A protein has these predicted regions:
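Short small-residue beta-strand/loop micro-motif enriched in glycine and branched aliphatics
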Residues: 102-105, 193-197
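Non-transmembrane alpha-helical segments in soluble domains
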Residues: 36-39, 43, 47-50, 54, ...
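C-terminal cap/loop subdomain of S1 sulfatases and analogous C-terminal strand-loop tails that border
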Residues: 70-76, 114-117, 122-188, 193, ...
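Active-site-proximal cap/lid insertion segments
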Residues: 1-61, 65-110, 123-126, 130, ...
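Intrinsic disorder/low-complexity signal
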Residues: 3-7, 42, 60, 154, ...
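Residue-level signal for well-ordered alpha-helical positions
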Residues: 77, 198-201
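Long, internal low-complexity/basic segments
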Residues: 7, 11-27, 200-266
């Protein structure tokens, strides 16, 4: 899915990806090779952690959660990095193992990172609380029967996004709502690469309406987008305004520095 080969990206994604185009095919191949190398490196480090647990005699009663916060577009749709709600960016690796976790099971229940925090509390024991959280423990989900129709939600408001983007996925369908832009609806079972937008297809109108209702039950997209942008504007102003923030980023300090009192203890 490359714009250079005629692929036409969604207008929201096209605006988001400005500045990432222009790589030659050789540069793209080298970038992919580097990414795969990083994946191998991370896998090796996870192996070291698991090996250390076994060597310490802790492998049998330690629960392990291996995951990430996002995927990687890796050139798909002409994009690199994260920030979009297509499968290549929002689908993440997630492997759990340990005490009371079914071995060699592939779970077909959709989950999201809101399920990770309850899982950590679950592993810590019932005294940790968390009963009122929106997610469900991954360990409980893994031990239960599969629920492919479970609904999951994601949103994005951050770097380079022209407006808020919201996604709900249920069963074989994914619905993406963009504030100020047209929506997208995909049949993931028959179109896993998300190339055919069904949002305007009359035959799928009821599915779109159902998923829009599910999204609306979670939040008001326009109000949430306005709130996020107001918070972002206030944060920029607290740090001296756009010019000051950009100058700091250009100087290599596009992060929050460690407080001096913490550095003194290191």
């Amino acid at each position: 899915l490359d714009p250079e080969d005629g692929f036409d990206p969604h207008p929201w994604s096209a605006r988001l990806s400005k500045g990432t185009a222009g790589l030659s095919r050789d540069e793209k191949r080298r970038a992919l090779a580097a990414y795969f190398g990083l994946c191998t490196f991370v896998d090796e480090q996870i192996g070291r952690v698991l090996g250390a647990l076994e060597s310490a005699g802790l492998g049998g009663d330690t629960r392990v959660l291996y995951t990430s916060d996002h995927g990687e577009s890796a050139g798909s749709r002409g994009m690199w990095g994260k920030s979009v709600l297509y499968e290549e960016a929002c689908q993440i690796p997630m492997i759990i193992a340990g005490n009371h976790v079914p071995a060699a099971k592939v779970c077909a229940t959709p989950v999201s990172l809101v399920d990770a925090y309850p899982a950590i509390l679950d592993a810590a024991g019932p005294q940790a609380g968390g009963a009122d959280l929106p997610g469900q423990s991954l360990f409980q989900i893994a031990a239960a029967a599969d629920d492919p129709a479970r609904l999951v939600f994601s949103e994005y408001h951050a770097m380079r996004s022209p407006s808020g983007a919201y996604m709900v996925r249920q069963g074989g369908y994914k619905y993406i709502s963009y504030v100020g832009f047209g929506a997208e609806l995909f049949d993931l079972e028959n179109d896993p690469e998300e190339t055919c937008n069904l949002a305007a297809d009359p035959a799928h109108a009821s599915i779109r309406a159902d998923l829009e209702a599910e999204l609306g039950a979670i939040l008001d997209t326009h109000a949430t987008d306005a709130h996020a942008k107001a918070d972002q504007k206030a944060l920029v102003e607290r740090h001296g305004g756009p010019d000051a923030v950009m100058a700091r980023a250009a100087g290599g300090k596009n992060f929050t520095e460690v407080p001096p009192e913490i550095l003194a203890e290191l």
